[in-house]
């Protein structure tokens, strides 16, 4: 590593050389062993340099980063040399490391995306490497033991994945065709599928955004599951072998007395090797190898993490796609870490034949709100908001006997239900309110005006003391007893006729009374017409 000279010195002390193969590791325990004499031996226990990735279990997250970006960040921080070239090139919307060591997390990424992962003695390899040189091994010469094996590993699989942004459920299944297998591997693959005909139904482990991704996932998953359909094991004294070495394996076939013909049984990549160095120049290795043409390695035997509900704070609700999603920061997310845009659980949500969007209960948490986050499939890469939480500085409860239920928005608009009074009150940010007091009374209060409208007809009351009513056709007033009107001035104007009819009619002016007609004024009675006054003038 180049991060410090001290680290380089440590590595130099940990290099093991088998005469061509270099293994760089980290010594984790040193002891003195003495037995049956006065002399002693130094015992050293250690691991590959990937041990530096064995941090304590931790959490981290990335948004819009590629697999290459994530793995390089982790290996660079740990000072581990790495060759990173995954087949998955696209940026991931959200990826979460959840209570895992850094190495366990990298293993899980290799499992989720079916990427190659191994340590070649000097470098952590993530992604299928470029083909290197080939080493020829012949049984009876470099190879002292050779086992050629095949096994029934292939299984048909199918499944689905849901993408919420476009409300699409994608279905896919494995192609059930072998890839990169030799003759033995192909035969084992076909035999396995003949044994297991019913496909297993599974979900895609990574988040899927389209059907092409789902089809590719099931294809690579089946390739990975069946990668070891054909394999060999062997014992060799060839010192240059390591994990990732390509070997061309030959066997000698006896065709007659003293006649042997050497044939290649194929090229293989070593996936597991044990080196044994004894006293003096003694050396032996034991290895397992798979056909070198396989597209993926077997999945790492690593469990998927199980995410638990946890607390978070909303950092944004300005969803760029206007879908009502939020971004949150969980307690362990530091610095720029936060989730991608995630959905919010609500009591009711959907559409109808009359409502295309937002049918249901739409209440998106505000920035700074404390929320509880859960995870679909318990997958840390699939968070959603389960609900909101009050804390000691934001909640006051429902009052004595829990009598009050209320709904209040950011601006102060409030609906309050009082179970003690049986009342309902609605109030806006200015204090304008509607109150039904539970005793048969309704009060509407406004600081400026109240307007009742039906079509173009309206009644308006304003804060300056005016009440007006307007009707396109008729206004009818009726009372079983009395109607009283009182004002400084009362003006009544009719565009055509103005009729007043009653059993008795009295018009009185305390100072004067005037009845006039521009064209004609008529006073008519079927009985007696009386005109009286101190002075009566008829002109």
Regions found by a protein language model. Give the residues of each.
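Short, solvent-exposed secondary-structure boundary/capping segments
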Residues: 31-46, 276-289, 321-327, 382, ...
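Surface-exposed cap/loop segments at beta↔alpha junctions
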Residues: 12-82, 94-95, 134
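Short, Lys/Arg- and Gly-enriched loop/turn segments at beta-strand edges
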Residues: 20-28, 254-269, 378-388
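Single conserved hydrophobic/aromatic residue that forms the stacking wall/gate
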Residues: 1-7, 11
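Structural signature for extended repeat/solenoid scaffolds and their inter-repeat hinge/linker regions
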Residues: 247, 309-516, 522-523
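Glycine-rich, acidic and aromatic/proline-enriched surface loops and short helix-turn segments
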Residues: 47-49, 64-84, 207-214, 316-347, ...
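Extended, domain-scale alpha-helical bundle/helix-rich regions
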Residues: 99-104, 110-291
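Short acidic/polar beta-strand-loop edge motifs in secreted extracellular
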Residues: 52-70, 84-108, 112, 142-143, ...
């Amino acid at each position: 590593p180049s991060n410090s000279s001290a680290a380089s010195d440590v590595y130099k002390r940990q290099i093991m050389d088998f005469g061509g193969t270099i293994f760089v590791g980290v010594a984790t325990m040193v002891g003195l062993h003495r037995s049956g004499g006065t002399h002693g031996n130094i015992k050293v226990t250690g691991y590959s340099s990937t041990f530096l990735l064995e941090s304590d279990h931790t959490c981290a997250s990335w948004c819009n980063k590629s697999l290459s970006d994530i793995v390089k960040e982790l290996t660079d921080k740990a000072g581990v040399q790495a060759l990173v070239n995954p087949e998955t090139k696209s940026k991931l919307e959200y990826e979460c490391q959840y209570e895992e060591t850094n190495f366990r997390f990298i293993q899980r990424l290799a499992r989720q995306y079916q990427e190659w992962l191994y340590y070649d003695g000097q470098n952590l390899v993530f992604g299928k490497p470029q083909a290197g040189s080939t080493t020829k091994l012949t049984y009876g010469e470099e190879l002292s033991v050779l086992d050629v094996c095949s096994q029934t590993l292939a299984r048909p699989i199918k499944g689905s994945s849901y993408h919420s942004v476009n409300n699409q459920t994608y279905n896919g299944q494995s192609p059930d065709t072998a890839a990169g297998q030799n003759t033995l591997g192909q035969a084992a693959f076909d035999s396995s599928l003949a044994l297991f005909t019913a496909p297993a139904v599974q979900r895609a482990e990574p988040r899927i955004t389209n059907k092409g991704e789902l089809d590719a996932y099931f294809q690579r998953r089946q390739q990975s599951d069946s990668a070891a359909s054909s394999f060999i094991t062997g014992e060799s004294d060839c010192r240059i072998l390591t994990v990732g070495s390509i070997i061309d394996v030959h066997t000698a076939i006896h065709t007659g007395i003293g006649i042997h013909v050497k044939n290649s049984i194929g090229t293989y990549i070593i996936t597991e090797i044990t080196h044994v160095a004894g006293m003096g120049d003694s050396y032996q290795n034991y290895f397992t190898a798979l056909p070198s043409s396989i597209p993926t390695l077997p999945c790492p035997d690593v469990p998927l993490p199980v995410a638990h509900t946890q607390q978070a704070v909303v950092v944004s609700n300005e969803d760029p796609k206007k879908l009502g999603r939020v971004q949150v920061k969980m307690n362990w997310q530091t610095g720029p870490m936060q989730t991608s845009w995630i959905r919010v659980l609500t009591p009711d949500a959907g559409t109808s034949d009359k409502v295309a969007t937002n049918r249901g209960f739409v209440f998106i948490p505000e920035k700074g709100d404390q929320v509880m986050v859960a995870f679909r499939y318990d997958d840390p890469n699939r968070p959603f908001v389960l609900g909101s939480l009050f804390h000691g500085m934001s909640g006051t409860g429902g009052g004595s006997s829990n009598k009050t239920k209320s709904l209040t928005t950011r601006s102060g608009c409030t609906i309050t239900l009082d179970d003690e009074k049986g009342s309902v009150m609605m109030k806006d940010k200015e204090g304008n309110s509607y109150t039904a007091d539970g005793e048969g009374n309704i009060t509407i209060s406004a600081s400026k005006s109240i307007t009742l409208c039906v079509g173009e007809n309206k009644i308006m009351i304003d804060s300056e003391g005016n009440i007006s009513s307007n009707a396109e056709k008729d206004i009818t007033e009726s009372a079983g007893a009395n109607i009283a009107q009182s004002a400084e001035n009362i003006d009544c104007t009719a565009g055509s006729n103005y009729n007043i009819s009653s059993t008795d009619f009295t018009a009185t002016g305390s100072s004067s009374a005037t009845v006039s007609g521009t064209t004609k004024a008529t006073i008519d009675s079927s009985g007696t017409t009386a005109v009286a006054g101190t002075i009566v003038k008829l002109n």
